[in-house]
Amino acid sequence: MFVEALKRQNPALISAALSLWQQGKIAPDSWVIDVDQVLENGKRLIETARLYGIELYLMTKQFGRNPWLAEKLLALGYSGIVAVDYKEARVMRRAGLSVAHQGHLVQIPCHQVADAVEQGTDIITVFTLDKAREVSAAAVKAGRVQFVLLKVYSDDDFLYPGQESGFVQHSLHEVVAEIKKLPGLHLAGLTHFPCLLWDEAAGKVLPTPNLHTLVQARDQLAKSGIAIEQLNAPSATSCTSLPMLAEYGVTHAEPGHALTGTIPANQQGDQPEYIAMLWLSEISHHFRGDSYCYGGGYYRRGHAQHALVFTPENQKITETNLKTVDDSSIDYTLPLAGEFPVSSAVVLCFRTQIFVTRSDVVLVSGIHRGEPKIVGRYDSLGNSLGA
């Protein structure tokens, strides 16, 4: 999906990854991340958000819940980390990093609510009154007021399978009335997902019905004299989409893919955020005229199509196609069109969610100074593997 953008925006990353691989420093099935470019992308996002009065929570799941990189990004001025599930929150807190937003996309389990409240989580999203009551009890016990967001939806909204949740919009007044009865809670705002999506036919990011529902819910409360401070609209957050979010009165967004430049809008390599990561593998064997590289990092929604194959003997890079991958099977190996020498390096660049892969994550700095250096190795869940 992003091979052409990678070649256009960050050819130095390709060279650095192949050089480190030739030195035996990077193994197959590794996401190689250009740390300096991620930080540059992060700065651009912060600067753009400030122009439009939007606060940004940092999302880490796309780059493998990586605490080292998260800490560097937080220093740029992000309002905190958003943990999309309780295991991501655990990784961040164990690394000494505070979690600003938790509960969306995945609710906090009952026996972890008290810890999330006591740890000082800025805001917690709730999908049910039952969960709101758990948060209320924990807040009272901790002697603090916990800010909460309500996730809302309407019947015609788009929800990904496995993410069906929230309060239906027409019940919002009744829900808010119940929330206001709960001690220790402050209703800070509303959220939904996905609020923006890339439209391939239009060639741009467009608002979803979900964003309209979110805005309508805010206006619905305002007419009843209930003002909210936070309108959180995640999905497809980027330098290009932030102005659109501002037009809708959005106050908070949560960039993830934009940090690595792997947003659908950047397929041609023409966005302010530059590609900052690639997936490196190696030819394992041949079968019936095609080559198979080591798998582990395939993501079925990644739109991976093209690969670069590097043969050390002649220092040649050849572009080929990734053949059809059976999404119902484990990606032990991935098929590439044509025969290439065994143990040649393979580079792909596609949309991923590293935390659901088996990949290693290799952090590299100094690429654009011509001095690439590995500064950290992690697994796909943010656990250090040493330098």
What are these regions (language model features)?
Residues S154-Q268:
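Active-site loop/helix belt of alpha/beta enzymes
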Residues Q23-D34, E118-I124, L159-G166, A201-T208:
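Glycine-rich tight-turn/loop motif centered on a GG-T
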Residues M1-Q107, Q112, L381-A387:
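A charged N-terminal "starter" segment
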Residues T237-I317:
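Active-site loop ensemble at the mouth of alpha/beta enzyme cores that anchors a bound cofactor
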Residues L45, V135, L214-A217:
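Aromatic/hydrophobic pocket-lining residues that form π-stacking "cages" and hydrophobic walls in ligand
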